[in-house]
A protein has these predicted regions:
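Compositionally biased, low-hydrophobicity segments enriched in charged and small polar residues
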Residues: 1-3, 128
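Conserved P-loop/Walker A NTP-binding site and adjacent catalytic elements of P-loop NTPases
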Residues: 17, 24-151
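Dynamic helix-loop-helix/coil hinge segments at AAA+ ATPase domain boundaries and subdomain interfaces
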Residues: 3-29
Length: 151
């Protein structure tokens, strides 16, 4: 893939697009189809097999918006709801590594990525941590339906 035929990667901040290309090469079919729709402001349901890039298909545009200042940090901007705590923990892990890579790309270019916190909340989340989330909300909250109902 050359710089002239990146397609949907052109939607993203150049540092995020370059990071993605370096880390993953070309976008998957799911990502190619999802990103323009998400960037256009539409609601999207992504259903695809494991390992097809769903997590970044769903989250990368929001991360881009936080990174560029289009969405101000300091409150929940991206909400992911799943009934499975194990899946929520996997999603969190699968977001932290890309965020580290994107942050490194920004630092290498002499820029600072705004703080983007990714936290999970479930019935098992200690009360002290829930209170801390209320005082200092994460930009990305991954939660269960039961916990969302209590927020």
């Amino acid at each position: 893939m050359t710089d002239t035929d990146r397609g949907p990667l052109d939607l993203f901040h150049p540092l995020i697009a370059a990071w993605f290309q370096g880390a993953y090469g070309a976008p998957t079919e799911v990502q190619l189809r999802a990103w323009p729709v998400i960037a256009g402001g539409a609601h999207v349901l992504i259903s695809a097999p494991t390992g097809t890039g769903k997590t970044l298909a769903a989250f990368l545009w929001g991360i881009n918006q936080l990174a560029t200042g289009a969405l101000a940090p300091g409150k929940v901007r991206i909400l992911y709801v799943s009934p499975l705590k194990a899946l929520n923990n996997d999603i969190q892990r699968n977001l932290l590594s890309p965020l580290e890579g994107i942050s490194a790309a920004f630092r290498a270019a002499g820029r600072e990525l705004p703080r983007i916190t990714v936290l999970t909340r479930s019935g098992d989340t200690p009360s002290s941590e829930r209170q801390r989330m209320l005082r200092h909300p994460p930009e990305v909250l991954i939660t269960t339906p039961e916990s969302l109902n209590l927020i």
